[in-house]
Amino acid sequence: MENGLPEVALIQPRDRKAWALPKGLIERGEPPEKAAEREAREETGLSGTIVGKIDTIKYSYVARWEKPTVRVFKIVTFYLLKYMEGDPSRHDWEVDRVEWFPIETAISSATYPLEKGILKKAKLLIASNSEERR
């Protein structure tokens, strides 16, 4: 939160100009929620705790760097995390840059339409959690 307004940490994956949400693979035997916390910590340098599930998206892309090229199908579940501690300069090698954005700016800055939708749902989840605490 900055001045009472929610903020979101977005990443620029290595060698890309895209702004995206952190995500990654679940390790064998790892619960999805723990994977979300771990991947967020690795990719952003920030630690957080799960507030709630936002949604799951499905998409595919062609990995042209593979020979022969292959189509990759992904299913990604996003969770809202509450920031606890950390330093965005401590992100891992998979990421070139991490920045905090006010949530409205994050929605407009996110490169991928499905992730814009996730951010809009996160905004609603944050608002509903704020209402519950009143």
What are the language-model segments listed below?
Residues 1-21:
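N-terminal strand-loop-strand
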Residues 16-18, 86, 106:
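A short, flexible beta-alpha/helix-coil linker loop
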Residues 20-24, 62-65:
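Short acidic, glycine/proline-rich loop/turn micro-motifs
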Residues 21-55:
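The catalytic Nudix box helix
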Residues 45-86:
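Active-site segment of metal-dependent pyrophosphate-handling enzymes
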Residues 78, 82, 89-119:
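NUDIX/MutT-family hydrolases
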Residues 121-129:
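C-terminal alpha-helix
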